[in-house]
Amino acid sequence: MEEQKRHSGFETMRILSMVMIVLMHGIGHGGLGSAAPQGSAAFWIYWLLFILARVSTNCFVMLSGYYLSERKGAVRAGRLFRIGAQVWFYSMLTFCVAVKAGAVPLSAISLLRALLPLTSNGYWFASAYFLMYLSVPVLNAVVQSLDRRQYKTLLLVALLLQSVWGTLFYWATDETFVNNGYSFIWFYTLYFMAAYFRKYRVTVPSGLCLLAYLAASAAGLFNRMLALRVENALHLNGFVNAVNGYQALDTVIASAAMFLLFQNIHIRSDYWRRWVFRLAPLSFGVYLLHDSDFTRALLWRLVDLPRFGGALLPSLAYLTGAVLLIAVVGYAVDAVYQRLYRLLHLPALETKLDALTARILQNIVGSKE
């Protein structure tokens, strides 16, 4: 994407979102969220940080809705190839590391999962994003065909079915295909939300956005407290995860507020804007490196976030350092990967794939009248 078409505020949000994803994984996958006694001040502070960071994945997807919703034409096969190649590289890299470390046995099944990561759901986000990207021409046709009233109705129905119904009746998530937000169907809703904001030039004052983000996050923490009591009392396994899912209404409100807040931000310094534009495209690699199914448990066992027994101040200091280090290493590794990608002249292959796909589609569908 050319720099002049990129939004410095949104690209800053892309970087921040990835750091927040690492933070969220540290509290969840890394075990810090369960290190302190349940109900203690430290316990709830960790989960408040988790909820504040929960918007990150939604915002990351919404960026695609903003950038891609005005694109015309068929899906770009070259871009699909780029996504697939990057996921495959990190899948094989982390698989080799895991096998070498003894964390994963070398078997036909594990090798097949590594070789076909988008089909094995080794990276749930990558699989869902790939399917969403494949659907972009259809999603854009919907975006461009609806008037404002119809569009509002679409969003209202989608949120009622997926956010409200999918949370209150969490045991029925398979019927709504939302799976607590771990689904390409939920990504469609996020895409439509961001596309709506762009199509109708929705703007909200920054102060109000910040207030809505903090208020919705506070509501998310309260809902988690309540859901934890209900889950423990009634043995409703999975209720807490549904209440704090990506699709939960408070998470959606906080995500929209964060998105609209960064829409108002424009970096004026050429120096910092160049750095943001350099780092932001590497963010996806940070996720692929640190959250592979093959090495996730190994990584967080090595980091050992609960080493201080959940004690608040040392744990927060250690968490901050660990999150920043993981993010920095991830950005550095992906910078190397992107250079290797260019050295192998794979961007030229993307162009050829786009041209080939266009010819095939023209032969199948025919040209416009």
Language-model segment annotations:
Residues 96, 229-343:
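Alpha-helical transmembrane segments of multi-pass integral membrane proteins
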Residues 66-74, 138-146, 193-203, 260-269, ...:
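Structural signal for the C-terminal ends of transmembrane alpha-helices
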Residues 151-202:
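Loop-centered beta-sheet repeat module
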Residues 134-160, 196-215:
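Solvent-exposed interhelical
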Residues 43-44, 50-61, 68-99, 103-132, ...:
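Transmembrane alpha-helical segments and their boundary/interface "anchor" motifs
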Residues 31-35, 99-106, 165-174, 222-238, ...:
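Juxtamembrane "helix-exit" motif on the non-cytosolic side of transmembrane helices
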Residues 45-57, 113-128, 169-190, 222-256, ...:
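Interfacial loop-to-helix transition and helix-capping segments at the boundaries
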Residues 19-26, 90-97, 156-170, 213-229, ...:
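Aromatic-anchored segments of alpha-helical transmembrane domains
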